[in-house]
Structure formats: structure tokens, C-alpha cells
Amino acid sequence: MNREEIIDIFTKTGAMLSGHFRLTSGKHSNRYFQCAQVLQHPQYTQKLCQELANRFENQGVQTVIGPAMGGILVSYEVARSLGVRSLFTERENGKMSLRRSFSLQPGEKVLVVEDVITTGGSVAEVIEVVKSLGGEVVGVGVLVDRSNGKANLGVRTEALLTVSVETYDPDNCPLCDQGLPAVKPGSRQIT
């Protein structure tokens, strides 16, 4: 898939939003990628996740893990394409962990996936969970990298779409200065 095909999917599904948004990272932005708008369409989910899977097909991936919520469908579909199992992490008392009797074997080769990264914070937490359980992270795959490649996760990272989107600290946000209310379209609570 080329960049234009990927952008076309995000545009057709209404997944690229403009306005004033509070991101999961706590930062503010004038653009938001609502990947759920894409992921509700199995034909697009399959196509995008197959492309991610192709980028890691020779890495010996044994398990794919994504953080709840956005990474669950991506993890499942990438794992299906690779013919391996899919797990997801969840927050428990504010800390990312594997629950539901999910486990990893020491040395298990894991691909971490996510729908969108801005700072890479959630993915970094998943990487730490994998390492703490003795797993080996072979890479990270994301649908959209809003950091324009600046999120350094310490492992090979593949993004289907890498974009540069303005982000602002809440204390220095021109959209707030204009009196525009910030909307929190994602699912994780900001503390």
C-alpha cells in the first residue's frame, strides 16, 4: 500500500478530524486521528493490518500485543495475518499490565502494535511489560505516527502513516488562548 491509499482510507472513513483536542498524552492539538472510524470497517482493518504484518513477517514474531483500547483490534488482525496469537495489555490502578491469565514465555518474540502514537507513552509501557516478563520485543508497528518519527521507542518502529501534527502543552496552547473548548475524543483518562 502506498501513502495515498492509506490517506484515502482515513479520509473516506472520517478518521482525520480537525478542531481542538486533548490527546491521551495530555497535549493539545488541532488534528486528531480517530482510528476507531477506520477499524469499524473490517475490509480496511484487514488491509492496513496485513500491510503492518508484511513489514515484520521475517522477524520470527510469536505473539502480537497491543494496549487496550486502540491496540486490541490492530493486535488481533496483525496476529491473524502472521498466524500467531494476539494479546492485549490493560491498565490496572493506572499501571499497564497483562491480565486475563495472559502470559509470555521467557525469550518469546513479541511485536507491539498500536493504532496511533503521539509521544509513544502507551507503547513504551507495553514494551516494559513485555521485557519484565522476559519477552523479546522485535519491533513496534503502528497505523499512524503523529510524532513524525520523533517517538524513540528503542526498537525498530514501522508506521503506515507518519505525519507531523502540531501539539501544544495545555499551558501554551494557542487554541485555548482563542477560547476554543478542547475535546477529549480518545478513551484513556487524563490525570
Swiss-Prot record:
Orotate binds at T118, R146. It is an enzyme of class 2 (transferase). 5-phospho-alpha-D-ribose 1-diphosphate binds at E114, D115, V116, I117, T118, T119, G120, G121, S122. CDD domains: PRTases_typeI. Its EC number is 2.4.2.10. It catalyses: orotidine 5'-phosphate + diphosphate = orotate + 5-phospho-alpha-D-ribose 1-diphosphate. Keywords: Glycosyltransferase, Magnesium, Pyrimidine biosynthesis, Transferase. GO terms for molecular function: magnesium ion binding; orotate phosphoribosyltransferase activity. Pathway: Pyrimidine metabolism; UMP biosynthesis via de novo pathway; UMP from orotate: step 1/2. NCBIfam families: pyrE_Therm. Belongs to the purine/pyrimidine phosphoribosyltransferase family. PyrE subfamily. This is Orotate phosphoribosyltransferase. It comes from Desulforamulus reducens (strain ATCC BAA-1160 / DSM 100696 / MI-1) (Desulfotomaculum reducens).
